[in-house]
């Protein structure tokens, strides 16, 4: 992933840089053709105060708005404090990774997924980032993935496999285990 300036505003990150990186990721991997005929919708909610919506058609046409959209495929929420600290510490891999690595397999997995998964990402200073993701507007079943920010970056970069992390104790999973396993295609 491109190095993101640690002083970038949330608005600039989510309205300009993130869509640019996602588009470049799809183009450079040659995945636009496989995404023809798809419409990926994403909503990012920061503390209920700021909302960013994305509609990506055919993997090439990106429409970004600073307002909510109805029935997004994926809705992500986190606190403004967590978002600002994620930017300042360069720990954006888990948040931005799926957008930059969208494939038809991940799109299809998301389309069929119904539930909520949470990530609790522990920082070196002991603080924790909390990211909540709701798929297809359904918030049950629920599972929580607990890992370090360093390990989450490795998952996003495909340097660590989630199942291996779970088996070795690097990641803990709480909640609905079947749903947790259903999320695996998003991270592999």
Spans of features found by a protein language model:
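Feature captures hydrophobic
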Residues: 1-188
């Amino acid at each position: 992933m491109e190095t993101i300036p640690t002083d970038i505003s949330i608005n600039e990150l989510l309205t300009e840089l993130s869509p640019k990186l996602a588009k470049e990721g799809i183009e450079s991997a040659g995945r636009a053709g496989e995404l023809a005929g798809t419409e990926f919708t994403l909503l990012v909610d920061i503390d209920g105060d700021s909302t960013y919506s994305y509609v990506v058609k055919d993997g090439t046409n990106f429409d970004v708005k600073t307002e909510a959209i109805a029935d997004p495929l994926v809705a992500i929420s986190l606190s403004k404090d967590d978002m600002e600290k994620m930017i300042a510490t360069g720990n954006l891999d888990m948040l931005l990774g799926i957008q930059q690595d969208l494939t038809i397999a991940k799109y299809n997995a998301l389309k069929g997924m119904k539930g909520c998964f949470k990530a609790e990402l522990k920082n070196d200073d002991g603080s924790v980032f909390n990211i909540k993701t709701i798929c297809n507007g359904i918030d049950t079943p629920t599972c929580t993935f607990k890992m370090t920010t360093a390990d989450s970056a490795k998952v996003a970069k495909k340097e660590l496999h989630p199942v291996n992390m779970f088996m070795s104790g690097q990641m803990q999973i709480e909640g609905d285990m079947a749903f947790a396993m259903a999320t695996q295609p998003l991270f592999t």
